[in-house]
Amino acid sequence: MRLLIIADEDPRTRDHVMKVFGDKDYQIVAPDSVDLVLKDVLRKEAPVVLLGNVFDNMPAGDLIPILKKCNKNLTIILVSNEESLPLLRKLRREGIFYHALKPAREEDRDELLQAVRCAFANITGLSGPVGAAAKGHS
């Protein structure tokens, strides 16, 4: 089972994303505070985080560098309808793996699923269990 953190302040988006991944061989963790996300990231238990624009009153642009300092191998997928190119460029420099739109339509859900599959494939090198590969990146 692949562990996936959903860190989004909007409960509707969080619930919707949980439904998208709930039956797809993923163990979903949806903490309600930054400190709980940091705890999981520091323990290197979850190799992929789906991060909204704002989480626990903290903008993604402030949170991403902290998450990457806690675990440089963490894969962050920004799930946002943000359209500001300068901001998206900044977040890419900070280390996001991918920017996906909030899954409002079927195409958005498919895109998000594909981005997460790709993230886990990169972590595992297309072979072996995710947990072992993630622990090997410590």
Protein language model regions, located:
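Acidic, metal-coordinating helix/loop segments flanking the phosphotransfer/catalytic sites
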Residues: A30-V48, G52-F55
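Two-component signal transduction core modules
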Residues: V49, I76, H99-A100
